[in-house]
Amino acid sequence: MNSLFASTARGLEELLKSELEALGAHDCKIVQGGVHFQGDDRLMYQSLLWSRLASRILLPLNEFKVYSDLDLYLGVQAIDWPSIFGVDKTFAVHFSGVNDEIRNSQYGALKVKDAIVDSFTRKMDQRPTVAKQQPDIRVNVFLQRDMASVALDLSGEGLHQRGYRDLTGQAPLKENLAAAIIQRSGWQPGTPMVDPMCGSGTLLIEAAMMASDRAPGLHRGHWGFTAWNAFNEALWRELTTEAQVRARRGLLETSSRFFGSDIDRRVIEMARANARRAGVAELITFNANDISKLVNPLPEGPVGTVISNPPYGERLESEPALIALHNMFGRMMKTAFGGWRLSLFSASPELLSCLQLRADREFKAKNGPLDCVQKNYQLTANPLGAGGALVAEDYANRLRKNVKKLDKWAKQQGIECYRLYDADLPDYNVAVDRYGSKVVVQEYAPPKTIDPQKARQRLFDVINATLAVLELPSNQLVLKTRERQKGKNQYEKLAQKGEFLLVSEYNAKLWVNLTDYLDTGLFLDHRIARQMLGKMSQGKDFLNLFAYTGTASVHAGLGGARSTTTVDMSRTYLEWAEKNLRVNGLTGQQHRLIQADCLSWLSNTDEQFDVIFIDPPTFSNSKRMETTFDVQRDHLVLMKELKRLLRRKGTIMFSNNKRGFQMDLAGIAALGLEAKEITALTQSEDFARNRQIHNCWLVTHSQEEK
């Protein structure tokens, strides 16, 4: 009787125990990551050939305490290695774990290798060769605290490597995990199965192998036991011959049929090739199709199971498309697959909620480092594909009301960029902005007291509802998360797409970028201020400080300004400003662009201007600025410098976004200036709920100064 250990992915131990017991294993004991069991030689080989769930089958050789590297060396050398494999065989050591003395797994593996080689040298005056690739013998050592376990890895390569999958698409499932997903799905051999996002076909192939009684190890070309001195070749040949007979008979007898599709034709060709190598190609029909074209391949029955591992995405920008995909998929399941079962495996339970289906069973498992969930659903017939109540219904109703009002208003105003929703409801803390045919959803970062998973679920509900209310394709929605920007973060790129969209604002054309930066290049709340500047600037010399992408300069130029001077510290934004000026025909020496620290430039210029627009940051500590700037603390210093540049009948428009900003009117008067607040005049209909989004002032020389 052999004492053996079968390892597996965390979360699959109970399934593996049941599988081993069905094969005839005794005394099965679950530990984290595997199952200890007993069995004779026949059972040992059967577990290697037939286990669909095990990652490896190990034969323990020794267990001992390790308090030093010498203890490790002596414990390994105590094993009679020449009785296990011949000196003419190659070997490799896989070492995992550390303790206070063995702090590096590579060092531990080196000590084990030395002990094995020295064991041969002492007894035979010869040494075996170490081979990193496909060794004849693989020694597994696991160190936990002060206990080391040494085992012979009978598998060689991991058992998930069945031998049929030479090529895969992106993010493939390991075969043993795929087998577990199928077993947990409720699918029964003899019934049909569909995978509409099948990738390289692993789920379908594993299920077809189960249905046709094909041993998962039948196609492997390399094992870890064939160079073992105790290898029973006759018994192994008997078992593999029996497995081949069963596979041929099973292929003829099974009534199961399998259907797979994927949008990627190249991946579908991989899936077909994998199925041929696995010997189950005749059971599986593969098609290259977009999931939106999915139909039930057996509309007249019998009913079966839809099993899939849909994409979950790691980048924020991909989430709107994935949310739309899951929402559409849920509707299709109800429309075309009534009476079937559905089982989905995903790293994102939030995306699964977008199906708008109620799961009747749920399992957890690891897919490599990812925590994943598998949810099973019983699909009820619904030929219209209608779901339940729209998710985030309060939000959807408010957005629908706002859209009806604001779309009409925007058309009358001659603008195509405006805010549709601005955290109107406390539970849905987002801003929704329309930019022509596209929509940007900005999530305000939730407080740390809010459960991150709950916040993420609520955001997904918002996106789902936004797509539905606006009847918007998912590729027209851009998702961003807005949080307090510190230092240079406000200038750093979020993406590298470089996609610009030309939009209209009154008589101006402006370039926006919805993906690459936190802001889009157009501050919507300053729209009326820009319009006012255009009217104020006819025949005037116009200065735009902290100019960002120069949109105010565009309006001034279109309003007939004699000259525009646009100053900003960022080369990126100045190049953007130049694009904005050029697309409006504002070229020539009278339209200057200056890259400089605005505060330093102010201190060093003596130029005169009729209209000055300044919209400084609330606070700045950029490395390229010599000092910090605080708009509340420093606005008088700023006004003193601006006064020098302002012609006697000129006007400064001063705006900032600091909530609770207090203009020092006495200090302004002491400078010989007058300030008049015009905030209410610069606030538009789409920002009616947020009266504190900015404050705005007109500053002129006092009557005495004039």
Curated annotation (Swiss-Prot):
It catalyses: guanosine(2445) in 23S rRNA + S-adenosyl-L-methionine = N(2)-methylguanosine(2445) in 23S rRNA + S-adenosyl-L-homocysteine + H(+); guanosine(2069) in 23S rRNA + S-adenosyl-L-methionine = N(2)-methylguanosine(2069) in 23S rRNA + S-adenosyl-L-homocysteine + H(+). It is an enzyme of class 2 (transferase). SUPFAM superfamilies: S-adenosyl-L-methionine-dependent methyltransferases. Its main location: cytoplasm. The keyword Chloroplast does not apply. Keywords: Cytoplasm, Methyltransferase, RNA-binding, rRNA processing, S-adenosyl-L-methionine, Transferase. GO terms for molecular function: 23S rRNA (guanine(2445)-N(2))-methyltransferase activity; RNA binding; rRNA (guanine-N2-)-methyltransferase activity; rRNA (guanine-N7-)-methyltransferase activity. The keyword Cytoplasm applies. Residues 43-154 form the THUMP domain. Its EC number is 2.1.1.173, 2.1.1.264. This is Ribosomal RNA large subunit methyltransferase K/L. The lineage of its organism: Bacteria, Pseudomonadati, Pseudomonadota, Gammaproteobacteria, Enterobacterales. The gene is rlmL.
